[in-house]
Structures are given as C-alpha cells and as structure tokens.
Amino acid sequence: MASHYEMFPAVVTRVEQLTPLIKRFTFKRQDGQNFPRFSGGSHIIVKMNEQLSNAYSLMSCTQDLSTYQVCVRKDVEGKGGSVFMHDQCNEGCEIQISEPKNLFPLAETGNKHILIAGGIGITPFLPQMDELAARGAEYELHYAYRSPEHAALLDELTQKHAGHVFSYVDSEGSMLNLDELISSQPKGTHVYVCGPKPMIDAVIDCCNKHRYRDEYIHWEQFASTVPEDGEAFTVVLAKSNQEIEVQSNQTILQAIETLNIDVECLCREGVCGTCETAILEGEAEHFDQYLSDAEKASQKSMMICVSRAKGKKLVLDL
C-alpha cells in the first residue's frame, strides 16, 4: 500500500559549507511548532518546488525537535535536487519538509554494532551513535572518505564519541580492511553500512562470506541503482484503459507522466513509498529500498519511479 507523508511548511535557518561538496541545512517549521519525533536512521523528503524533491537522512539530535538538519552532497549529474539545494537554497528559503520515516533503524538488541560509512553516508549514523551511547551499547564507526577535505563531520564525531571512531583516507593510502573487520566481530554483532553502492555491495558480500544472518546486516543507499541499459517494455494501465511504451532510458513514472496521469511520488528514488502501485499482471524487477525482500518476491506491487518489468509487459492498477 502506498505510503503518504504529512508535509510541513519550513524555512531554512542556517546553511553551512562542511566540505567542498557537502552543505548542512538547518530547518525550522514556519508555524513555530516542533517537528515530529524521529529515531536514528530516519529520513525526510525535502520538497523544493513542484518539480524537485529528494530524500535525505536526518542527522540532528533526536531530543531537539525545534529544528531538523540534513547534509546534501552536490551531484551535478543527479536529478537536480542537490544542485538546487546548493545553489539556490539559502537562509530564509521556504520549502516543504515531510514527516520522518525510518527504513534504516538500529536493532533493539545485539552484542555489538559496527557502523560503516562512505562519504555522505555518514549522516544517518550521527543520531544513531548518540542512541547507542545512551544505551551503553558497544559500537564502532568506521568512516572512509577520499581526502581530508572531504571528511564531513569527523571532528564533531571524534569529540563526542572518542575511542569509537576509526577513519580511513583514500588519498593517504589508509584503506578499510573489510574482511579483517567483519571476521573479527563477536557473534551477535549487527553491521550497518551507508555509502556508495560498491561499498554497500562489498560489505554485504563480506558479511555473507562470514555467515552473518540477514537480520544482522543493515544497509541504506539513496542513489538510484537502476541499470542504465534496461530494455524497453509495455505498460498497460488497467483503470485508465491506456497502454504506453517505456523506453530503455525512461522510468515507468516518467512514461506515465507523458499521458498527464497524476501519480504521487515525492522522492523518485525508490525510498519514500508514495508511488507504490499494484501489479495486476506480469513481474517487476525491483530496484527500490522501500519494499522488503518478501514483498518484492510476492510481486504484488512495485515502485514505479525506479522498478521495471522483468518481461515485455506489465499491467498496473492505474
């Protein structure tokens, strides 16, 4: 069932340049009220205008709800949202902020928690580390980045979590040895990873190699994982009695929008769940991060902003 988000008019109260490519944005509600409560790992949808909206991990303190904070890495080859945030979203800018949702929560139990971050993937771990510290849990952050000038938030983290933070700098030849890290953990350790897809894949593969159960491996990635060389296919819209060809370089959502059919989709990254659509016939190749593995295997619904057809035809409840 499609997810729906309550939206709050907000204003940007502070913009900080943390690295050459990363800015931190602080938001307040326009009505002066507190934002909803959230837990570490939660994301929000930032709606910049009618065309642009992106999902970002909340990185602010879970106890201070007067503001929300996110970090945005500028990606000139992306959909345009990060460029808008960097180039046009200044202090005083009015935008829409969604209520938080958490698809990347901390496990409630576990002997130890290993957090692995690459680049901008550090953001969800800030509130999570605070939560783990408050629990008195055993935890470590392993943070890899390209060069010292790209080490967003490292000083803040090492000050708050001394002895729990380990950093790896590509430009200095300091590499994270995943096999050594994963294999040396006690039984019952949870592993979390957020960062570029190659890092996520490597962590998952390493955990599988050392026989970690699926429920002990947690990952989050907002960048799209849709292959660029997909095949064209046909989509039949059962309710509107229309048929459309989805080209290899199109998403189903983009194709449907050419018919002027309105489908709600906030993130366009397979994260928020707002475009979830029932599958009446055919099978989907799932690329979203919203549905569970079991839900994907059931082939009952799909996220039309990123997922595609396995075969030549899909019939959707639209």
Curated annotation (Swiss-Prot):
Keywords tagged on the record: 2Fe-2S, Flavoprotein, FMN, Iron, Iron-sulfur, Metal-binding, NAD, NADP, Oxidoreductase
UniProt binding sites for [2Fe-2S] cluster: C267, C272, C275, C305
GO biological process terms held by the UniProt record: carnitine metabolic process
Cofactor(s) listed: FMN; [2Fe-2S] cluster
Reaction catalysis annotation: (R)-carnitine + NADH + O2 + H(+) = (3R)-3-hydroxy-4-oxobutanoate + trimethylamine + NAD(+) + H2O; (R)-carnitine + NADPH + O2 + H(+) = (3R)-3-hydroxy-4-oxobutanoate + trimethylamine + NADP(+) + H2O
GO molecular function: 2 iron, 2 sulfur cluster binding; metal ion binding; oxidoreductase activity, acting on paired donors, with incorporation or reduction of molecular oxygen, NAD(P)H as one donor, and incorporation of one atom of oxygen
Subunit and partners: Composed of an oxygenase subunit (cntA) and a reductase subunit (cntB).
Pathway: Amine and polyamine metabolism; carnitine metabolism
Main enzyme class: oxidoreductase
HAMAP family in the cross-refs: Carnitine_monoox_B
Segments forming domain 2Fe-2S ferredoxin-type: 233-318
UniProt source species: Acinetobacter baumannii (strain ATCC 19606 / DSM 30007 / JCM 6841 / CCUG 19606 / CIP 70.34 / NBRC 109757 / NCIMB 12457 / NCTC 12156 / 81)
Cofactor note: Binds 1 2Fe-2S cluster.
Effect of a null allele: Mutant cannot grow on carnitine as a sole carbon and energy source, whereas the growth on succinate is not affected. Mutation abolishes trimethylamine formation from carnitine.
Its job: Converts carnitine to trimethylamine and malic semialdehyde.
Protein name: Carnitine monooxygenase reductase subunit
Any one Pfam family match given in the protein's UniProt record, by short name: DmmA-like_N
Family stated for the protein in its record: Belongs to the PDR/VanB family. CntB subfamily.
Name of encoding gene: cntB
Superkingdom per UniProt: Bacteria
Assigned EC number: 1.14.13.239
Cross-referenced PANTHER family: PROTEIN YIIM
FAD-binding FR-type domain residues: 5-107
